[in-house]
């Protein structure tokens, strides 16, 4: 019988404790990129809905690598990003204890889908949210202008309140997601003027992100419920003849201190945690309404980004979309927050110019053989179900 080790590295990271369910379904952003006043005014983040994943083929542009100028196959994620609607602006002042909210100015009219966010039960409510606030505009708007002037005078950070247009997605939910997004570039006065000009107007994703940019994605991961210690922490299974179970921790601590330490791996909630995945390269920013949104210079097939039959458990993307490298946290239909990278990545992977050669649009349900309905019809001919009865 071989000997056993006396010491071993611990299983699982303690850096993500507590491993409990996230309090909010939307990915929260606590930090934004550094403000550069010489750049034009623009948003630093965007909201979208995870639609699904696909496969892309491209030539690797990495001199010195054995795969340089050779085809590689990569996984990519499609995020449905309908335009955001700006409905407010918030000013923050710097204090010794950090940023403090100075005041918030809302737009005159708010749509029903965002007003639903302020009610737990919209059907039984009186639906009077923001009716008194809108009266400030009905008078002369002087009070609103005074609040905007306060932000220009005292604030050092300006963020806008923007909500998604969830009615443009295949989701059954009617309540839009609302978020604060920092505005960078220009002076504080320029930021406030930009926010006021965009009240009740839409901002598209192509005005925030561009191709080959590095972004971070904040979202809530897929939930797995109550899981055992072996799956939750990756601890080693015990030998076959172990009494009272194998997928357990044999020793959960010494006699004294007479309690279980917080560092000991235990069973509990796994998944549905808030996570931020950094450094995803933007492969494409396009519109699903474009009939060639899924085509490339190499593949001239007239097809959209949607696979045949739509994305499984999501449907068809009908708005602007982003194609990101790799996988991102969350399940399909989950709201995700996409933010500009906090630092400038100068690695070759980040600065590489990506030219996609092929985007897979075959059915994601089963083993898809055809890229377009026309290709399927050309191969199978007219099917019996398509004939007029």
Swiss-Prot record:
Subcellular location: Cytoplasm
SUPFAM superfamilies named among the record's database cross-references: Translation proteins (SSF50447)
Keyword Cytoplasm: yes
Gene3D superfamilies listed in its UniProt record: 3.30.1430.10, Ribosomal protein L3, domain 3 (4.10.960.10), Translation factors (2.40.30.10)
GO BP annotations listed: maintenance of translational fidelity; ribosomal large subunit assembly; rRNA processing; translational elongation
Keywords, sorted A to Z: Cytoplasm, Ribonucleoprotein, Ribosomal protein
GO CC annotations, alphabetized: cytosolic large ribosomal subunit
Alphabetized PROSITE patterns for the sequence: RIBOSOMAL_L3
Keyword Ribonucleoprotein belongs to the record: yes
Coiled coil: none
Main localization of the protein described in the UniProt heading: cytoplasm
A molecular function GO annotation: structural constituent of ribosome
Family label: Belongs to the universal ribosomal protein uL3 family.
Name under which the protein is recorded: Large ribosomal subunit protein uL3
Source species: Debaryomyces hansenii (strain ATCC 36239 / CBS 767 / BCRC 21394 / JCM 1990 / NBRC 0083 / IGC 2968) (Yeast)
Lineage: Eukaryota, Fungi, Dikarya, Ascomycota, Saccharomycotina
